[in-house]
Amino acid sequence: MQKKVIAAIIGTSAISAVAATQANAATTHTVKPGESVWAISNKYGISIAKLKSLNNLTSNLIFPNQVLKVSGSSNSTSNSSRPSTNSGGGSYYTVQAGDSLSLIASKYGTTYQNIMRLNGLNNFFIYPGQKLKVSGTASSSNAASNSSRPSTNSGGGSYYTVQAGDSLSLIASKYGTTYQKIMSLNGLNNFFIYPGQKLKVTGNASTNSGSATTTNRGYNTPVFSHQNLYTWGQCTYHVFNRRAEIGKGISTYWWNANNWDNAAAADGYTIDNRPTVGSIAQTDVGYYGHVMFVERVNNDGSILVSEMNYSAAPGILTYRTVPAYQVNNYRYIH
């Protein structure tokens, strides 16, 4: 009887050892569409804080195809600040969480305009893991001559593969449609797109696609075409640029954030306490107030916002989720 017990213990220990070895074997995880930091941390038996620490994440925002470290020690930022060289000429930098074009440009003694030119970017959106050219000459492959032609599909409609630097408004302008139509065709309820993503640009929405029509239902939304005169790197500077990117340009004369609700109302915008994708969250709290861009409205009532000069230095783009119970603390400019 004693021998059987010992054998059982040995067998159980062996199985546990194999399971532990298999779990430890996975050191990285490639993010899949729809995944969250919670789901990934739960899968590998680590805390969200540990997962964020391993990958130097400053928010819970992750992107499809992003490679995350799930075991080991945290990445050193000293190596990430050194650009890698390429046999084709020029140096490259891998975007880290919290980076912005201006921040990267200052690291390498160049301008954000030059980095945009080198990489064929036409907006300020970058994402962790993206490889950017920071010196050399612009590659001819950055021209979007081929990518601007949508592929056809036997199921009806045409499709476009998202390139680095694309936005929904930019894609819509290429194909003579609206960003709202593209959102409807693809069942999108926020403005997040990523390189390699396949978007339907013509045809009819599939039966399982969600509708994005609620993003601006019944709202007065004047559109301005002003130059951005807000102070670089401030919350107002970022929100002005994000609204321009989605084709809903705002005035450059609303001054400090604590004046935006009154100024927007005077310009004819709808102001209420209901967040929608693309709206501006505004508060008078603080000396100058604060504004944020609503990127996503979650099913639980919380919202994902992008902002500058809140939890990081001016010019650094950050994301955070505002809990549902705090959503009504803000006014929303539509």
From Swiss-Prot:
Residues 71-90 are annotated as: Disordered. The keyword Lipoprotein does not apply. Residues 1-25 form the signal peptide. Keywords: Antimicrobial, Bacteriolytic enzyme, Cell cycle, Cell division, Cell wall biogenesis/degradation, Hydrolase, Repeat, Secreted, Septation, Signal, Virulence. It holds the Pfam family CHAP. Gene3D superfamilies: endopeptidase domain like (from Nostoc punctiforme), LysM domain. The keyword Repeat applies. Residues 71-86 have a biased composition (Low complexity). GO terms for cellular component: cell surface; extracellular region. Peptidoglycan hydrolase involved in the splitting of the septum during cell division. Binds to both alpha and beta-chains of human fibrinogen as well as fibronectin, which suggests a role in the colonization of host factor-coated material or host tissue. Also exhibits lytic activity against S.carnosus and S.aureus cells but not against M.luteus cells. One of its GO terms (molecular function) is lytic endotransglycosylase activity. It is found in: Secreted; Cell surface. It comes from Staphylococcus aureus (strain NCTC 8325 / PS 47). Its EC number is 3.5.1.28. Residues 210-334 form the Peptidase C51 domain. It catalyses: Hydrolyzes the link between N-acetylmuramoyl residues and L-amino acid residues in certain cell-wall glycopeptides. One of its GO terms (biological process) is cell wall organization. SUPFAM superfamilies: Cysteine proteinases, LysM domain. Induction: Repressed by mgrA. More protein is secreted in a secG mutant (at protein level). This is N-acetylmuramoyl-L-alanine amidase sle1. Residues 27-70, 91-134, 158-201 form the LysM domain.
